[in-house]
Amino acid sequence: MTRRTMEKPFGCFLLLFCFTISIFFYSAAALTDEEASFLTRRQLLALSENGDLPDDIEYEVDLDLKFANNRLKRAYIALQAWKKAFYSDPFNTAANWVGPDVCSYKGVFCAPALDDPSVLVVAGIDLNHADIAGYLPPELGLLTDVALFHVNSNRFCGVIPKSLSKLTLMYEFDVSNNRFVGPFPTVALSWPSLKFLDIRYNDFEGKLPPEIFDKDLDAIFLNNNRFESTIPETIGKSTASVVTFAHNKFSGCIPKTIGQMKNLNEIVFIGNNLSGCLPNEIGSLNNVTVFDASSNGFVGSLPSTLSGLANVEQMDFSYNKFTGFVTDNICKLPKLSNFTFSYNFFNGEAQSCVPGSSQEKQFDDTSNCLQNRPNQKSAKECLPVVSRPVDCSKDKCAGGGGGGSNPSPKPTPTPKAPEPKKEINPPNLEEPSKPKPEESPKPQQPSPKPETPSHEPSNPKEPKPESPKQESPKTEQPKPKPESPKQESPKQEAPKPEQPKPKPESPKQESSKQEPPKPEESPKPEPPKPEESPKPQPPKQETPKPEESPKPQPPKQETPKPEESPKPQPPKQETPKPEESPKPQPPKQEQPPKTEAPKMGSPPLESPVPNDPYDASPIKKRRPQPPSPSTEETKTTSPQSPPVHSPPPPPPVHSPPPPVFSPPPPMHSPPPPVYSPPPPVHSPPPPPVHSPPPPVHSPPPPVHSPPPPVHSPPPPVHSPPPPVHSPPPPVQSPPPPPVFSPPPPAPIYSPPPPPVHSPPPPVHSPPPPPVHSPPPPVHSPPPPVHSPPPPVHSPPPPVHSPPPPSPIYSPPPPVFSPPPKPVTPLPPATSPMANAPTPSSSESGEISTPVQAPTPDSEDIEAPSDSNHSPVFKSSPAPSPDSEPEVEAPVPSSEPEVEAPKQSEATPSSSPPSSNPSPDVTAPPSEDNDDGDNFILPPNIGHQYASPPPPMFPGY
């Protein structure tokens, strides 16, 4: 009996022991996030003296072992310290790292010293694919004779210690496919002999130091990290033959200095937030064999100088927003074997570019706007973009006088530069916060088809990056409205712009690709950001170049999101062209994104957004995929290929852009179309990223309404867009109030808008809005035509704030009620959109309210989305086209008009209740009535953003 009882406990113990052993081995094979964090803490504790080593460290270590020379002793100290930093070594790579014979250690290579051939030293370390988990201790700085350091495809984490700067003979440094974090490893800048730098597939972040291109490097692999900045202009000094920027968060333009890279053979930009037109200097890259700029936010036409790429074998421009004609000069390049230009907006191609036209060359023209070709975008998606192509001769990126990396500037210089704008600015300021709510408009982004892409474009456009995503919350956007003046003239054209929105869509098409488009936006936003604050002032002067003005605008509004606001600002300018004001709205969206975005990037392309390991903590697993990249030989290509898709993630950031389209809704006639946008649904995804931002601005609710408030007084008139819904003839009752007080009321509206999308909506609502906004754009243009004239005087009518409230939903009626009002400012308000107002407009300043401008508002968003077209959008604030002519008339009443824009904004949201806000707008007018059109206008402008819903203003 005793023996049996003894066996039982023993058996249990044996089982427990086996279980423990199995767990141990399992844990050794995987590195959890907690373990990675633990390793990082251990490294930080080991990094004394700021990660550097004391000069006398070898004397501090007492060794009884004998070494052939002091350099091998130092190597022994370094390698033993490193072995202790190994947390997991599944292949027992360091099992024989014992004893003084360091040259026999696995992965360690010795050679005669360069300065003394009689001395044997450790010259190289190669632990590629060893799957070791650990960190780099500062003692590695003792390996001063190492020229080759390869540790790719492991699980090393933490930072690159500063002590490695002592490895002055470093020739090849490969730490790819690990889990390193922190800024760019600047120790690489201190190695005079470095030729090969491979840090891809890690989690390095921040800006890329310009000095990296001053070094005599042959290969630079930066792909699949978290770098976010513009590409330094110093790139032209680089002697590298291979450079990969893929799957990061780079934004802005491709520097024109790229044409000076005479040794360049391969360059890859896949999956970033780059935007604008391609610089003509690319044609000077005579030795390039691979050029990949896919999944970004590039716009305009392909430069004719590409015919100078005599040695190019592969070119990929897919998932962007290129337009125009693909010529024979490119497709007949002598060594070209693969040319992909799918998922863009090309509307023509030479016969030699048609897939299947050549047995030796492969072409892909899928998802463009080509007639008589299969698998192309719908006319609805193409019209907005193709009808307003980006003029690269005026684009900053292509060397023109345009504004900023965003192509948007180029769009419409037409601009009226309405003087009213000025006044508007002030109003905007106050309302700004409200406008933020506009974000909800973002949903509208849906710009019909593009929906996903669409939003991404928008964002990028304005903000250039990042902010867009965040959240439009930054009420700021409204602020920009004032700026709109600049844009204004363009706005008139706006009608067309609206269409562009779809453009983003194209990316969407891709579904997975969608992301790419986004990126584009982000980039755009970035550049603008800086300018934004200044921009606001210029607005007026910018008139001509509306495109840029938008950017500036943002600054005004809210420190945080200013960039986005810029867009809005153009609208302001237009005053008469209220539509422009809408523009600002889009920015809003973008702004928030910006934070993200950049990351998020070109949406469509890579739905893969996840793509980059960015998401999770660097430590997470994402790194594994590239394991082998390390190998130098492949390094060049392999990394890139994977990156291709990963980049997409960043694009999401831009979802905001979609809002851009909302402006179109103002059209009124389009109202029905408004809903067609449903597709935009996709945009929502991106929004999530920013959704948080919206919370920030409790205003969210105001999201849409805010915009309206700004302009509401005057806007009411324009609510035209909303008019669709505006049935709120009630607004008309306000007519009596015509007084211009409207401006003050503007704030009132902010509340209504919120209801529409309220912050949350931004996150998800974006999708819904998209649905409507797109269609409207198409029609919106026409309506605007009339509203502008009336706007001039209409502002006063808006005064009656009371009406606005009720109008919130009545929107439908408003559309036509305006006609009656022509005579009186108020009546027009509703129909503002309707032509009736136009007639009266001339006489009644109120109509002048260019309620339509609001439409543009939503468009604003679009501008970003456009990214490549962004310019177009800007100018195009949906209604503007028609209004353009009228604009002038409105100018007189200009101030009122400012308000109108606000309303328009509501329109964007139109699909949602948002239209209601527009009514609110009306109320404000009553207050300011006597004051003077001038003051009124400014206030309205501010809100232009949010008003999406307001369409209903009867006054107009």
From Swiss-Prot:
Superkingdom, natural source: Eukaryota
Sequence segments annotated as region (Contains the Ser-Pro(4) repeats): 651-956
InterPro entries membership: Leu-rich_rpt (IPR001611), LRR_dom_sf (IPR032675), LRR_extensin-like_regulator (IPR051582), LRR_N_plant-typ (IPR013210)
Tissue specificity field: Expressed in flowers, stamen, pollen, and pollinated carpels.
Glycosylation sites recorded in the entry for this protein: 273, 287, 338
Keywords: Cell wall, Cell wall biogenesis/degradation, Glycoprotein, Hydroxylation, Leucine-rich repeat, Repeat, Secreted, Signal
Record GO cellular component, one term: extracellular region
SUPFAM superfamilies for the chain: L domain-like
PANTHER family: LEUCINE-RICH REPEAT EXTENSIN-LIKE PROTEIN 3-RELATED (PTHR32093), POLLEN-SPECIFIC LEUCINE-RICH REPEAT EXTENSIN-LIKE PROTEIN 1 (PTHR32093:SF124)
Stated name of the protein: Pollen-specific leucine-rich repeat extensin-like protein 1
UniProt organism field: Arabidopsis thaliana (Mouse-ear cress)
Lineage summary: Eukaryota, Viridiplantae, Streptophyta, Embryophyta, Tracheophyta
